[in-house]
UniProtKB/Swiss-Prot annotation:
UniProt organism field: Clostridium botulinum (strain Kyoto / Type A2)
Family: Belongs to the UPF0102 family.
Transmembrane segments: none
Entry's Gene Ontology molecular function annotations: nucleic acid binding
Top-level lineage group: Bacteria
Protein name: UPF0102 protein CLM_2733
Length: 123
């Protein structure tokens, strides 16, 4: 069962949302967009606001999904997060963290694996 990249990404984000809800996160935003970029998921985990990038792949053949998050991409996520923090006026109310969720889909059936990488990068 193969999909185009956009479909794979959307499916992975759905899996990621379910996964972090089960971990106790509260979803605040999905696909937050602004002129600077996009953040897949923004969630609350205890006293942290967590900005989450989801990467979905069918295999590790080209490395782990998180390896696709270059420094340039991290910087875009960071700047987008700054705008969100300012827009919501939450800079003094929470700690902030950048997590990555890797979703690996099985090409033979509907199974998948999920890996949450907390505090995956800092800028």
């Amino acid at each position: 069962m193969h999909y185009c990249n956009k479909d794979i990404g959307s499916f992975g984000e759905t899996i990621a949302v379910d996964y972090i809800k089960n971990c106790g996160y509260i979803i605040l935003e999905k696909n937050f967009r602004c002129k600077l970029g996009e953040i897949d998921i923004i969630a609350k985990d205890k006293n942290f606001i967590v900005f989450i990038e989801v990467k979905t792949r069918y295999s590790y053949i080209y490395g782990s999904p998180s390896e696709a998050i270059t420094f340039r991409k991290q910087n875009k996520i960071y700047k987008t997060a700054q705008l969100y923090i300012i827009k919501k006026a939450i800079h003094n109310k929470f700690y902030f963290r950048f997590d990555v969720i890797e979703v690996i889909l099985n090409t033979l059936n509907s199974n998948y694996s999920v890996k949450l990488i907390k505090n995956a990068f800092q800028i």
